[in-house]
Amino acid sequence: MPERSDPLTRSLIALIRGYQVGISPWLPPACRYYPTCSQYTLEAVRRYGALRGGWLGIRRLCRCHPWHPGGYDPVPDLPGSAPTQKPFR
């Protein structure tokens, strides 16, 4: 899927990358998920744009707390974008 290129999306990507490069290295590792919350949000914004991708990132950040087990949590695909299986006959 091609990367979104509207100004809001590019700005949000720049902010996330700024956090990843300038702030995150100075903090202890705390994310319970793979990919990390910032990488997840970056991928979601690149895939779905600033609004939907940003919303997915906010939802992910709300789930990242000590009482949640975490684990592998990839950015979801759009409904209907997964290959469909033919019905069994």
Curated annotation (Swiss-Prot):
It comes from the Bacteria. It is a peripheral membrane protein. GO terms for cellular component: plasma membrane. The keyword Cell membrane applies. Residues 69-89 are annotated as: Disordered. Its main location: membrane. It is found in: Cell inner membrane. The keyword Transferase does not apply. SMART domains: Haemolytic (SM01234). Pfam families: YidD. InterPro entries: Membr_insert_effic_factor_YidD. Keywords: Cell inner membrane, Cell membrane, Membrane. Could be involved in insertion of integral membrane proteins into the membrane. NCBIfam families: membrane protein insertion efficiency factor YidD. Belongs to the UPF0161 family. This is Putative membrane protein insertion efficiency factor.
